[in-house]
From Swiss-Prot:
Enzyme class: oxidoreductase
Pfam families: Mqo
An example molecular function term from Gene Ontology annotations: 2-hydroxyglutarate dehydrogenase activity
Residue pairs linked by disulfide bridges in the UniProt entry: none
Obligatory cofactor(s): FAD
Family the entry assigns: Belongs to the MQO family.
Gene responsible for this protein: mqo
Record-level GO BP terms: tricarboxylic acid cycle
Protein name: Probable malate:quinone oxidoreductase
């Protein structure tokens, strides 16, 4: 991977992407496929792409398709579960698979390097949660997107699906699970690197690592200047389009841009930790992503799950994440990040969210006070036979949830949101979960907002339909199209 020397680089680009994570890399890949002549600059403060939230050990969940994440189907007052969010996330992930399949067909990606088939399982304990999971199963399995979902309370079958979870469990305990065999684990750090390497080979992308944006300001309509600081010197670059895809670092940059749209936003940082096992005798026996049910008041990134996960090509088990609080906006950020983000325009919203979500703040602080024994006891609820010596504590990535000023006051949002300038010359991605798995869909939204004329052109429309054969259609209302999408993706991505 080539990292440019700032002093010898050009000064004008068609697009500058700040942050070399999965979002910026996906946007760069889409832009290059739509117009190979575009010149792109990617700026990263760390020494290589994909080291912050996109890295496998930092990502709260990989391969999100709403197959097993129970927080995407909340229980409703009438006893049913809401399915709209699960359907939207599943469709978004299918679109990501569709894009990766197209780049694989072109020889630009090797899916075996970052993509692995892993069953997705939801598991619950106790009669009340069994009733919830069965209701979820009945509703989702009736939809084409989740038609392959299986349900079981049979101990022998559950032991086949998740042997480590069932071993040592009391026979009297009520257990139920659902399973979708066509699930995945995705190493978004490796995928980010693959995107960047391919784009560099084409000559379309210049990557500048160890480089920070110290200032950005408008020069005029559709014109931005960015002042960059690098170990080898400083320079200024100009561009008609800026994307702020720097994870938790996007909010401070958005605020520095001065666009009026930024005034409505603040950030609520959430940290996390994993228990990680690399013992081959255990990693070989657990081949699934097993998601449980979050505690009442817990944030989405704290949904307990036991993950088969490939980290830099090596198979591991991750359990957690254990939530916590840190004032940093990035794992490799500053403890002053939260304080520095406070503005007159967002201070009231931050206070209102603090009061409205006091239980959440209390929960996060209590998680911080957990001892090694406390964390291990939580693990044993999932793995009754777990041995402490097989697991080590690892710090997960930092998430910055959105605080947004609304007519009803400050509101805490747990998803992601694209914030863009009125003229489309700048866009930022704020928030977290489901994040990386929906990158293609989210970056298409950025293109629709900020490159609307080009997106409406016949040349871009033709290229989009080749890249994404389902583009412009809703697979959830066209079951045959969904089947065709999956057959194509399965074939090109070697899902066997």
């Amino acid at each position: 991977m080539v990292v440019s020397d700032v002093a010898g680089s050009q000064s004008r680009y068609d697009a500058v992407l700040v942050g070399a994570g999965i979002m910026s890399a996906t946007l760069a890949a889409l832009l290059h496929e739509l117009d190979p002549e575009l010149s792109l600059l990617m700026v990263e403060r760390l020494q290589a792409p994909g080291l912050e939230s996109s890295a496998a050990e930092n990502n709260a969940g990989t391969g999100h398709a709403a197959n097993c994440e129970l927080n995407y189907t909340p229980l409703q007052p009438d006893g049913s579960v809401a399915t709209a969010k699960a359907l939207a996330i599943n469709t978004a992930f299918e679109r990501s698979l569709e894009f990766w399949a197209s780049l694989t067909e072109k020889g630009k990606l090797l899916p075996q390097q970052f993509l692995h088939l892993v069953p997705h399982i939801s598991v619950v304990f106790g009669d009340a949660d069994l009733a919830f999971l069965h209701q979820r199963f009945q509703q989702l399995s009736a939809l084409p997107a989740f038609a392959s979902m299986q349900w079981s309370t049979d101990v022998a079958e559950l032991a086949e699906w998740m042997p480590l979870v069932m071993e040592g469990r009391a026979n009297a305990e009520s257990v139920a699970a659902t399973c979708i065999k066509r699930g995945t684990d995705v190493d978004f750090g490796l995928l980010t690197g693959a995107y960047v390497k391919s784009l560099q080979a084409s000559g379309a992308l210049e990557l500048s690592c160890g480089c920070e944006v110290v200032h950005l300001h408008r020069l005029g309509k559709h014109q931005w200047n960015l002042d960059l600081k690098h170990s080898s010197g400083s320079r200024s670059v100009q561009t008609p389009f800026v994307f702020l895809g720097a994870g938790g670092g996007a909010l401070p940059l958005l605020q520095r841009s001065g666009i009026p749209e930024a005034a409505a936003y603040a950030g609520f940082p959430v940290s996390g930790q994993w228990l990680v096992c690399s013992e081959p005798g255990l990693t070989a026996r657990h081949h699934a992503k097993v998601y449980g049910k979050a505690k009442v008041g817990a944030p989405p990134m704290s949904v307990p799950h036991l993950d088969s996960r490939w980290i830099d090509g090596c198979r591991s088990l991750l359990f957690g994440p254990y939530a916590g609080f840190s004032s940093k906006f990035l794992k490799q950020g500053s403890r002053l990040d939260l304080l520095r983000s406070v503005r007159r325009s967002n201070f009231r919203s931050m206070l209102e969210v603090g009061f409205k979500n006091f239980d959440l703040v209390t929960y996060l602080l209590s998680e911080l006070q957990q001892s090694e024994k406390d964390r291990f006891e939580t693990l044993k609820q999932f793995l009754p036979n777990a041995q402490l010596n097989d697991w080590k504590l690892s710090v997960a990535g930092q998430r910055v949830q959105i605080i947004k000023r609304t007519a009803e006051g400050g509101r805490l949002q747990m998803g992601t949101e694209v914030v863009s300038a009125q003229d489309g010359s700048l866009a930022a991605l704020l928030g977290a979960s489901p994040g990386a798995s929906t990158a293609v869909t989210v970056m298409l939204e950025v293109l629709q907002r900020c490159w609307s004329e080009r997106m409406a052109s016949e040349s871009w429309q033709q290229r989009l339909r080749k890249l994404l054969p389902s583009y412009g259609h809703d697979p959830n209302s066209e079951p045959l199209l969904l089947t065709q999408m999956r057959i194509r993706s399965n074939k090109l991505l070697n899902f066997t």
